[in-house]
UniProtKB/Swiss-Prot annotation:
Protein name, UniProt field: GTP 3',8-cyclase
Entry binding sites for [4Fe-4S] cluster 2: C268, C271, C285
Pfam families: Fer4_12, Mob_synth_C, Radical_SAM
Keywords: 4Fe-4S, GTP-binding, Iron, Iron-sulfur, Lyase, Metal-binding, Molybdenum cofactor biosynthesis, Nucleotide-binding, S-adenosyl-L-methionine
SUPFAM superfamilies linked to this entry: Radical SAM enzymes (SSF102114)
Cofactor binding summary note: Binds 2 [4Fe-4S] clusters. Binds 1 [4Fe-4S] cluster coordinated with 3 cysteines and an exchangeable S-adenosyl-L-methionine and 1 [4Fe-4S] cluster coordinated with 3 cysteines and the GTP-derived substrate.
Its job: Catalyzes the cyclization of GTP to (8S)-3',8-cyclo-7,8-dihydroguanosine 5'-triphosphate.
BP GO terms, sorted: Mo-molybdopterin cofactor biosynthetic process
CDD domains: Radical_SAM, Twitch_MoaA
Length: 344
C-alpha cells in the first residue's frame, strides 16, 4: 500500500491556468457512483453501477487529490453518488485532512444526501470539515420518498441535526422541479434560515437518461426568483463560496439564498473547477463530454511527474463554456453520463 504520509509530491509548479486565463483552484471528486437514493432527476430506478474493480482505490484517490493540491487546488469537494456510502470513506477523508493542517488546502468539504450524516458527522468535524452541502428538495415525507424513490426524510433531518451539533455549517441544496416542489420553496427557505442554514436553488440539468421527460421537470429559476420576490425582499450581494451560485439576502428571514442557473444564466465565465470521477476520468466541464484518463497516467508510473503532465494537458483543453440545452423535440440529454458518475 502506498504510504500517503511519506510519498513526496511533485515539485511546486505554476498555477493551473486554462486557455481563457481562469485559474483552476477547485476540484470536485466523485468517490463513488453508488447512492442509497434514486432521485428521479438524477438516475434511473434500476441503475447499473460500475463494477467495484473499476473504481480507483482510496489510496489512488488520495494520490490524485494530493497532486491537484500541489498544483494549486485550494478547495476540495467530495461527491458521489453518495460519498458516505463508499466503504472506508473516513480513511480517505482523514488522510486528506493533512492538507488542511499543512495549509496547502483551504477547504475540505462534501455534498451529501444526508442519509449517513448522523453516523459520520462527528468524524467529519474531527477531520476539519467545516461546511457541507445537503441535498434536500422537500420537507414533505411522502414527496421526499417519491422524489428519492425510497429515501427516509427523518434520517436526513437527524443527520442535519448531528452535523450542526458537531459544529459543521450546513447549506441546503434544492433542485427546483416544476409542479413538484415549486410551491414549497418559500417554506423550505423559512425552515432553513430559521436554523441558520443557507439555501441554494438549482435548475435541473440535462444529464443522463432517466425514465421521465426532463422537459416536464424543468423550472427556470428566473421564474422562481420572480415568485419569491412577491413574498420576500431580495437584495443581491457579492457573497461567493467558490462555486457557481449567485446570492441574495432575504430581509424577512435574515438568511442567504443562492441560485445556480446553468440553463437560463450560465456561470462559465468565472469557472474555476474541474471534476474527477471515481474511475479516474477528469472532466474539464460539467456540460461537455471531453475527458482525460488520469487513471492510466496514475498507474503507469510511481512518479507523480507523469500524472502532473497529464493534468496539465487536460487543463489546456478546458472549454470556455458548457453546451447544456433542453432537447424538447427528442427528449435527449445534452450529456449522456449521469450526474451520479460525474459528481453532483
Amino acid at each position: 500500500m502506498r504510504n500517503v504520509q511519506a510519498q513526496p509530491l511533485v515539485s511546486p509548479t505554476e498555477p493551473m491556468i486554462d486557455p481563457f486565463g481562469r485559474a483552476v483552484t477547485y476540484l470536485r471528486v466523485s468517490v463513488t457512483d453508488r447512492c442509497d437514493f434514486r432521485c428521479t432527476y438524477c438516475m434511473a430506478e434500476h441503475m447499473t453501477f460500475l463494477p467495484k474493480k473499476d473504481l480507483l482505490t482510496l489510496e489512488e484517490l488520495d494520490r490524485l487529490c494530493s497532486v491537484f493540491i500541489e498544483k494549486g487546488v485550494r478547495k476540495l469537494r467530495l461527491t458521489g453518488g453518495e460519498p458516505l456510502v463508499r466503504k472506508n470513506i473516513m480513511h480517505l477523508i482523514g488522510n486528506l485532512s493533512r492538507h488542511l493542517k499543512s495549509g496547502a488546502l483551504d477547504e475540505l468539504t462534501l455534498t451529501t444526501n444526508g442519509s449517513q450524516l448522523a453516523r459520520f458527522a462527528g468524524e467529519l468535524a474531527d477531520c476539519g470539515v467545516r461546511r457541507i452541502n445537503v441535498s434536500l428538495d422537500t420537507l414533505n415525507p411522502e414527496k421526499f420518498r417519491t422524489i428519492t424513490r425510497w429515501g427516509d426524510l427523518s434520517r436526513v433531518l437527524e443527520g442535519i441535526d448531528a452535523a450542526q451539533k458537531a459544529g459543521i455549517h450546513v447549506k441546503i441544496n434544492a433542485v427546483a422541479l416544476k409542479d413538484f416542489n415549486d410551491a414549497e420553496i418559500p417554506e423550505l427557505i423559512r425552515w432553513a434560515h430559521g436554523r441558520g442554514m443557507d439555501v441554494t436553488l438549482i435548475e435541473t440539468m440535462p444529464m443522463g437518461e432517466i425514465e421521465f421527460d426532463r422537459t416536464d421537470q424543468y423550472l427556470p429559476l428566473s421564474q422562481v426568483r420572480a415568485d419569491l420576490a412577491s413574498q420576500f425582499t431580495l437584495a443581491d450581494i457579492p457573497y461567493r463560496t467558490g462555486g457557481p451560485a449567485r446570492y441574495v439576502t432575504i430581509s424577512e428571514t435574515g438568511g442567504r439564498l443562492g441560485f445556480i442557473t446553468p440553463m437560463t444564466y450560465n456561470f462559465c465565465e468565472s469557472c474555476n473547477r474541474v471534476r474527477l470521477t471515481c474511475t479516474g476520468m477528469l472532466y474539464m466541464c460539467l456540460g461537455q463530454n471531453d475527458d482525460a484518463d488520469l487513471r492510466k497516467a496514475l498507474r503507469e508510473s510511481e512518479s507523480d511527474e507523469h500524472l502532473s503532465q497529464a493534468i496539465d494537458e487536460a487543463i489546456s483543453r478546458k472549454p470556455k463554456g458548457h453546451d447544456f440545452i433542453i432537447d424538447r423535440e427528442h427528449n435527449r440529454p445534452s450529456v449522456a453520463r449521469h450526474m451520479s458518475l460525474t459528481g453532483g
